Amino acid sequence: DYCSIWKLNLNVKKCKVIIFSRGKVRNIPDFFIGCEKLEVVTDFLYLGLKLNYNNKMFVAQKDLCERASRAMFALLKKSNELMLPVDLVVDLFDKTVLPILTYGCEVWGHEMVEAVTKLQLKFYKFVLKLRLSTPSVMVFGELGKFPVTVSIKARMLSFWMKLCSPLNSNKLSFVVYKCLLNLYFTDRHKNRFLS
């Protein structure tokens, strides 16, 4: 009805439905646009983040790690072909692979981030031609780098400060955050981001 009023045409092949729930939904209702049935999916790629029906960000992290891993190996291959110095390769990693790895971390950074740090260390050890058993502290010290989790936590705090800012009190994100906070403090909603 809305589409016909505003004369909008939707591509039904690109429209998907995802039902967010704690467990898998057994009785899936049918969704239609006009007389065309929409597909119900468990995962959906939205703005570069893979959303999962159970609202866990593990699926998004895994997807980002896979993409970053492909970029990392492409960078390693090219840097070996061109015989680039270590400092340049590390700088290229920071500028090309880390943005893929940390994309949307303000949202998923409160979940397990071991896989992200593991990929970062794997790259550094490859570049320095070290064994995988080399202590992580030595690798970070040698390169003068911090674990990517430090950057993730800083970005999360920055996002949270913007979210809580009174300047944003008329924005929907601020209102939703306040509602979630109220539910959290009355023990009606549990959320790792709020705790």
Question: Where do the protein language model's features map onto the residues?
Answer:
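Catalytic palm subdomain of template-directed nucleic-acid polymerases
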Residues: 1-4, 20-24, 53-57
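Short amphipathic alpha-helical coiled-coil/interface segments
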Residues: 68, 93, 116-127, 156
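Mobile genetic element proteins and their domesticated derivatives, centered on retroelements
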Residues: 3, 7-10, 17, 48, ...
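Basic, alpha-helical interaction scaffolds
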Residues: 35-108, 170-171
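A glycine-rich phosphate-binding loop feature that marks nucleotide/adenosyl-phosphate handling sites
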Residues: 13-23, 113-121, 137-146
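Extended C-terminal regions of large enzymes
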Residues: 94, 119, 132-195
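Short, conserved micro-motifs composed of acidic
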Residues: 8-42
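Short coil/turn segments at secondary-structure boundaries
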Residues: 13, 87-88, 104-110, 133-141, ...
